[in-house]
Amino acid sequence: WLFHPERPFWQVPEAKIGTEYTASKLNGELSESSNKLRLFSSYAGEGKEGLTYAQAARWLLSVNGYDDTSAKPKGKDLPSVGAGWLGKLGYIQAQGNNLFETLMLNLTLLQDGVKLWGENQPCWELDEPHSAERTEIALPDNPAQLLTLQSRRLLLNREGETVTGFSLLGGDFFPRENAFAEQMTVWRDPDAKKSKKIGQVTFVPSRHDPAKQFWREFPSVFCEEGESVRKPGVVRWVEMLQNDPDCPLERKRLIRFAISGMKYGDKDFFVNDSFSDSLTFQAALLGELGRRWTVPIRDEIGRCERAAQYVGRLAWELSLAAGDKNDTTAESARTQFYFTIDQPFRLWLQSIDPETDKLDEKADEWQEKARKLAAELGRQMVERAGNAAFVGHRVEVKTGGKKDEKKTVLYTAPKAYNSFLYDLRKLYPKKEGGTA
């Protein structure tokens, strides 16, 4: 079926006129273009020049979903299709304990948990397969059509038993605005001010930031929906399952949500890297019992963001005190702070039992942990700052006035550290009987 003369699997014969690529571009572990080789490649020599049929079939699906925008159209005045549909998403899926559970958790029998789907029609059941280049279609109204969307027209090339490359044209696409048939993406309002002004919100898929831990996205994925927040369809579906008394999804069962995506270069012209992350917590957090927990969790994540800013400011002031003006100092310190609290926060979130735990006690538990971790990181930063930072340096800074007036400020390590501890204690007040 991979090389059927009329209907090859996930391909169209008409794609033979498209842009030609080698097997190293098809191989998702390389995604290597002809004019830009990977420096540290997992394949070399003949291993880069060809793929087995099994490998090619797998990567065929990958390039269809995640292809970049480097291919040139063959026709004139054709619209831009952008990256492959999956590459445009902030992809998210629920994961069970085995393949069957994973399939069932992601098989949203109702669109967004409330709306019936249309009749399923995968691309291979069409009377006439789509073959025209860069074709705008209506938003699919059934999951089969969406899951088999041909973002690219593809045709494999082979020599004997080896796939040596492929030809590619732009395929089907539809506007991403309010494309709510897509159940496995995070959403965002790209212009909240305009939406508020006209009283109408437009949502688009929100790509994940590979530099940002998934738990930091918790408010936009799992919290209550509002004017500018819309939950992914698969999250709504699992919520519905959790609230159904006849559903076998036990409250205390741990459920995992995983995200993945591609990091593209300028204008999605090439793939820089791929990434993935996951988050585990009790299924009850998505049910009625968990509603009262989402706001406290969101608040703690917000406090983490502010603590990161305090750590970054401490690093910046320490660098000024030492006579250094490295612009990356603050960002590096914030990254280090998030790395420090990453696993502790995941474990705290996973430990929450909405049925038996008390909100205040769990919040206090995390705040004490976060305060200790931030304070220890700050102490280490001060120790590494050196003697010059303890003596300090005078630095000219702008006063913020209209005439760009400046004043001289003395930055020292003790002064910066005391200010940091003051802010930290305000953010995480020490509870009676607590330590640190």
Where are the language model's segments positioned?
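The −1 position to Zn-ligating cysteines in a subset of zinc-ribbon hairpins
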Residues: 48-51, 153
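Extended alpha-helical scaffolding segments
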Residues: 1-35, 62-436
